[in-house]
Every structure is written in C-alpha cells, then in structure tokens.
Amino acid sequence: EPAAPGAAGAGRFAAHPRVREALERRNDRIARFWLRDPARRAAPVEELAGRRVLIVDAEDTFTAMIGHQLAALGLEVTVRRFDEPYGFEGHDLVVMGPGPGDPRETGHPKIAHLRAAVTRLLDERRPFVAVCLSHQVLATLLGLGLARRETPNQGVQKEIDLFGAYERVGFYNTFAARSADDKLTHPEYGVIAVSRDADTGEVHALRGPGFASMQFHAESVLTEDGVRVLAEALTAVVRSSPGGLLPG
C-alpha cells in the first residue's frame, strides 16, 4: 500500500539530528522514571521493601501513578477509594491521595471523610504521607491558614527548596496552605518542619513525627526525581514514627 502523501518527508524530518536533539532536550527536565521500560523501573529501598501500603484514592487519576512508584520502591500496594470500605489495620503505611475539591468545604462528604481519616492517623500515630488535597486537609488540621491562589497551578513545574534540597517538582493546585515560619509546634502532634516559599509563605511540604505531606505531585512527569522524593518522604516517616511501624 503506498505511503500517505508527505509521510516519507515527515519521517525524514523526525529523524533529523537537530530535530531529535530538540525533542530530547524537552525531556531533560521531566521524570526519567516514566520514560523507562516498565520492566526496568524497579528500585527497591531497603527500609520500605516488603512493607504494606494503603493508598486512599480521593478521585484522582494520579493515584494510579503513585501506586506504580510505590511498587517500584518494593512496597505491597493496596488502593481503596475514599467512599468504599477500607481499614488502616493490616498496613504499615498509608498514603492519603490527591483529588479535586475545596478543602475549606468541611461539610462536603469527601472533605469530611479526609479530615476524619487524617485525624485518626494523627491520633493513632499511624505513619502516613498526604498528597495535594490531603496535604491541604492536614495543614488545616494542624492550624495553618488556607487560601485560593490568584492563579491556579495546573501542570506548573517549579524549583523549590525542599527541606534544604533544591528539587524541580510539578504543581496542580488551586488552593495553598500558608505559613510565616519554617517550623510549627502543635500541642498534640509535636514539632513540624515546614517547606515553604520564603516570599509568599505558600507551603510546599510538611514533616512531623510519623507523617509527611506534599502540595506538589511527586508522581507527576514534571517532578524530575519524584521516586526519590517520595522514597525520602516515606523513609523519613518510618524513621520518625513515635512507635515505629504499627503491627496492624
């Protein structure tokens, strides 16, 4: 069958060294993890390998990507929607996932559920990580203010200071927690480190005893070293958990 008109020319254009170089440059600042063959993504971390992790899906397609990253780190992954039956028992770690919604609408069924779940994790000292919407919920429970951004972040890559390390990460948020300080002390949950924008006070991430959170998406293709960033957050949670990993 004859080639479609212009197909040969288009093929030659795509194969041109300068075109290929330009296309490769576009990939310089995105996550290499997602460019690898799935069979070559495994990178188990000793402190995490074999642990059981529950992801609570708050209606976000990014949840599946988080699952792939956690599996690559050697964790045994279970995913449950926020509105279906699940339990924290039987899991070593919990990831409260991202999702659409206004975290200020505490009467909304999903927001109410996330608030109750995060409160229980905090009170029971269960090791967990909260992402995006769940991060915002955690921030409000810790007493931080929350505001709508003038311009939403919808697939915006930024370089941030993440607890002393510069990371290029992807943001997808309409709301943001704010803090005037790099540290806050909660009467029940202890001292919490705050990664934030020094100019605006927008909170990028939190780390406390047995928990961590991030406003950005470590699983996004826009987060260059997302798997490492996620692994470091989980490892910090394991190491700082007041009672270690709970038996179930």
Description of each model-found segment:
Residues R115-R120, E124-V131, Q136-R228, E232-A236:
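Pocket-forming structural segment of enzyme catalytic cores
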Residues T78, P109, P152-N153, G248:
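Residue-level detector of alpha-helical recognition elements and their boundaries
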Residues E47-D60, Y86, P127, F163-F175:
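Short low-complexity stretches enriched in small and charged residues
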Residues G74, R148-R149, S241-L245:
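Secondary-structure transition/capping residues
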Residues E1-T61, T185, E219-G248:
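RNA-binding accessory domains that recognize and position tRNA/RNA substrates
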Residues V19-L23, L70-A72, K183-A193:
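Short, mixed-charge, low-aromatic patches
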Residues R52, D60-V131, Q136, L142, ...:
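Flexible gly/pro-rich beta->alpha loop and the following alpha-helix that scaffold active-site loops
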Residues R40-P44, G90-D92, S134, L206-G210:
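Short amphipathic alpha-helical segments, especially helix-boundary/capping motifs
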